[in-house]
Regions:
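Sec-dependent N-terminal signal peptides
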Residues: 2-17
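Generic N-terminal leader/processing signal
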Residues: 1-2, 135
Length: 489
């Protein structure tokens, strides 16, 4: 059986699971106990908990988050101030229990305006009954500046990568916590005039409806199909890949279909869109690139490493598929699996994956027969994550074309990955997902990388271009790419 190695990005903070409890039963002491358990799990089980911050700094950050929770022991505050915030690991996730979260949603009034962030500015991203123009800039909510609100939003990213691809409207709702169902905003109109407005909160069903009718993102079809392509103009083909979590044979058949079409129609340009691609199977990365490589053979280089190969924290460890707690045999089998596939390095305290780890790994990867040799533009954003960041990193290393959009959410040279462990906290029933290894891209395997950047785009969208596209209800990055290709033809 072919073994698949998956690199998943768990970007959603609030992913429902199943249980039978209500929020009113969770006491302050229960929140604090679960916080302490979660912190212990992370510090003992994460493959490199002090990658970005010293032990002293991590301890101080945890103390600060715990004090914030102690001051306001509420359901949503438990997640906003979760211990996972201190590590700088976008793969580590805290997920809610379905019934608890449903109770919370039913008791919460949501911000009624859809928003979108570009270059640190928050813009109105949909029609509304208050006649606030699409493209108006949001300045304050309930006397709190947008800058302060953005700082409070937990970022799903590696290291200190600046993330602005977040659902600001949702977090305004979570952070507001007022009981009178109102939001007082200050905003700037398109002609520069500052105004105030009083808004009525809406229930979750209404919020969900509004979010589905926002202007951006435009490409809703690809979000449904995962892989989707079509002609932009007689010279240019658009290929959107929203996930790499496909069986390799299925993925190849889809790519073969589109690249055969590209060859038959003799397109000169290709726009590849991996915005909002949260990752998947790392073996699919060179597969996609093989259809556009300029070289007959290109280097596909990645390596797994971890400082923790054993299960050090076994309490509350569960099988996420069955919700069953791990037995001693489960733990023993898991430890044996890792010990057989990771060898201690001669220097440092890392264990690196050996040849037994990945029998699908091909370092010198051949170009596909249907390869495209024209010009390529790659679209990325902060939600280009995990394995998708490896694709962007490979694309940039090979100098295959221009990258348009925003910095990726994972580091360009490494991230965490693979063989996730899942824990269920005893009181809040929160599940924690922790990766067991790191993965290093393109021959980067430095033990001590205190800072990282994502893959940096060659072209970012300035506010004027963004606003014009938003008002016209056009995809800003895609429109910029088409114009870029036309200018350089």
């Amino acid at each position: 059986m072919i073994k698949k190695i998956f690199v998943f990005s768990l970007l959603s903070l609030f992913t429902p699971l199943f249980s039978q409890y209500s929020i009113s039963e969770i006491s302050k002491d229960s929140y604090l106990k679960d916080f302490d358990v979660a912190a212990a799990i992370l510090l003992n089980q994460h493959p490199n908990p002090y990658r970005f911050h010293s032990k002293e700094t991590v301890t101080k950050k945890l103390d600060s988050l715990r004090k914030a929770l102690e001051k306001d022991p509420s359901y949503i505050n438990f997640y906003i101030n979760s211990p996972g915030r201190v590590l700088g690991d976008g793969h580590t996730s805290f997920s809610t229990d379905a019934n608890y979260y449903e109770d919370y949603l039913n008791s919460t009034y949501f911000f009624p305006l859809m928003t979108y962030v570009n270059n640190g500015n928050v813009y109105i991203n949909g029609d509304n009954k208050y006649n606030i123009e699409i493209g108006s800039k949001l300045l304050e909510v309930n006397n709190k500046s947008i800058a302060d609100i953005l700082k409070q939003i937990p970022a799903s990213a590696d290291g200190n990568i600046k993330v602005e691809d977040v659902d600001v409207s949702q977090y305004i709702s979570f952070l507001n916590r007022n009981k009178d169902n109102t939001f007082t905003i200050k905003y700037q109109t398109l002609n520069g005039e500052q105004k105030k407005a009083n808004l009525e909160g809406i229930k979750f069903t209404g919020f969900n409806y509004e979010s589905k009718h926002a202007v951006l993102p435009i490409d809703a079809t690809s979000e449904i199909y995962g892989i989707f392509g079509y002609e932009l103009n007689p010279d240019t083909f658009y290929l959107s890949v929203k996930s790499f979590s496909y069986d390799e044979s299925f993925f190849y058949e889809k790519l073969k279909k589109y690249f055969q079409q590209i060859k038959n129609k003799k397109y000169k340009n290709l726009v590849v869109d991996i915005r909002n691609n949260s990752g998947g199977s790392v073996t699919n990365i060179p597969l996609l690139y093989s259809f556009m490589s300029k070289e007959k053979i290109f280097t596909n280089s990645y390596k797994y490493g971890s400082k923790v190969i054993d299960i050090n924290y076994s309490d509350y460890l569960i099988d996420p598929q069955t919700d069953r707690y791990y037995s001693e045999k489960d733990i023993r089998d898991s430890n044996n699996f890792m010990r057989q596939r990771f060898d201690k390095s001669e220097k440092g305290d890392y264990y690196f994956g050996n040849n037994r780890l990945d029998d699908t790994y091909i370092k010198n990867y051949p170009r596909d027969g249907l390869f495209f040799d024209g010009r390529v533009v790659l679209l990325t954003n902060n939600r280009t994550f995990s394995a998708a960041t490896y694709f962007a990193s490979l694309f940039k290393k090979e100098k295959r074309g221009d990258i348009v959009g925003k910095e990726t959410g994972s580091c360009s040279n490494f991230t965490t990955a693979a063989w996730f462990l899942t824990y269920k906290l005893p009181n809040t029933k929160t599940t924690i997902s922790i990766p067991r290894t790191e993965i290093f891209f393109n021959n980067n395997e430095n033990d001590n990388i205190p800072n990282c950047t994502g893959v940096i785009p060659d072209h970012k969208i300035d506010d004027n271009f963004f606003l014009n596209a938003l008002k016209e209800k056009i995809d800003p990055e895609l429109q910029y790419s088409v114009e870029l290709l036309s200018r350089t033809s």
